[in-house]
Amino acid sequence: MKKENNYISTDVNHKKLIFGVVIIHICFLIIKNSGITDILKEKNIFYGVLINMIYQLTLIIMIGVAMKQYLITSFKKFKADRISVNIKRVLAGVGIAFLLSCIAGIIEMTVCSNISVPANQSNVNGYFVDYPILAVIMSVIMAPFTEEIIYRGILFRVFSKYGELCAVLSTGFLFGTMHMLSSFGNTNILLFLCQWLDYFLSGILFGFIYKKYKNIWINVSIHGTWNLIGSVMLLTKIMLTK
């Protein structure tokens, strides 16, 4: 089994930064989905984009300072593999993600008579309509990096003390739940569970990928490519409906 890089610095300040990254992530999602940011977005959707950009940049800076050596070491190992090998890994990961998404979609269509767009996705769609370039940057580059660092790079390590399978399941559960916070109380329970399942399965997949390769950049590459495909499809749909 591949050994994970020991990226947790002995520097107390760095440990505080890593802890702060997780806390800021949780607090931001709670505030974002409480309706407070919706008031600003109703005035101007750019405020929503701006808040998200500031949030992502803050996390990226904190992660860069606290986990610099881990990121550099992992990237060197990622670069050491042949490009063709990494491409195959990304394509395999995206292929499995597509299969899991199809399974979740079939279950949703079978179980739920009323199909609607998850609230999380609705917000993203609005950004793509008005600010497509910024939306792509956030969706394809920023979000995959910060989410993979938080769920696989930090929390996976925490839960792996109880076994790597526990880490995969726990981070998958948290990944799915955090993406569905905005739907709590806003939809029927069956629809909520079906939509949550899609994110949960994605989280489980990313967890197993990290368990196998122990390299965060492989996760970021697969996550980013998956989001890129979704972004292209969404932008194409927007262009065709104009």
Regions picked out by a protein language model, each given a short descriptive name:
Residues 102-105, 130-242:
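Transmembrane helix-loop-helix hairpins at the membrane interface
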Residues 1-11:
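Short, Lys/Arg-rich, polar N-terminal cytosolic tail immediately upstream
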Residues 64-74, 209-213:
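Structural signal for the C-terminal ends of transmembrane alpha-helices
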Residues 16-70, 119-126, 134:
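Alpha-helical transmembrane segments in multi-pass membrane proteins
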Residues 42-47, 72-143, 185, 240-242:
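Juxtamembrane helix-loop-helix connectors linking adjacent transmembrane helices
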Residues 13-30, 92-97, 170-174:
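Alpha-helical transmembrane segments
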Residues 27-52, 109-110, 183-191, 232-242:
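Juxtamembrane/transmembrane-helix boundary motifs at the membrane-water interface
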Residues 37-46, 112-116, 158-169:
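Membrane interface segments of multi-pass transport proteins and intramembrane proteases
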